[in-house]
């Protein structure tokens, strides 16, 4: 499979008018293969297993929020980068998940060919199914290089998507608290 991938990269280089045998490009096919292998490594992991591996009983019934989880992904339409951050909140219903598992789950979904809308839904759905909270809120803010580098070429434009479950939909106060917390200034001086 690696050889076929590298040959395809060589062919792309030829098609755009480059010489894949020139010094600067000799190792490019191998580098591109390794880069894509890493950037799509999310297909090799199950995010629900990651979450299930760190569930803990808890009497907490207040919002748990992790914000500014940075990620990068590849747009499934153009294979160009998506760079952004994710805010994830849930209200426990007898269980909490280890905090490190939330960004790990985000990385798993991000390291697949994606569209932002789908990734937002996948994160919310995985949390809802695995920890069965009273509610889940997910907001993703991202820049899309397919918008900035080609087509309309709108540099620094951002896209925001959200997915809400349970009490984040049904309870306006919960929803308002979530959006207020993710939009408040964050200073982390410890």
Curated annotation (Swiss-Prot):
Q: What is its EC number?
A: 3.5.4.16
SUPFAM superfamilies tied to this protein: Tetrahydrobiopterin biosynthesis enzymes-like
Enzyme class per UniProt: hydrolase
Q: Which UniProt keywords apply?
A: GTP-binding, Hydrolase, Metal-binding, Nucleotide-binding, One-carbon metabolism, Zinc
Is the keyword Cytoplasm assigned to this protein? no
Q: Which reaction does it catalyse?
A: GTP + H2O = 7,8-dihydroneopterin 3'-triphosphate + formate + H(+)
State the NCBIfam families in the record. folE, PRK09347.1-2, PRK09347.1-3
- What is this protein's name? GTP cyclohydrolase 1
Query: Which organism is this entry from?
Result: Campylobacter curvus (strain 525.92)
- The gene coding this protein: folE
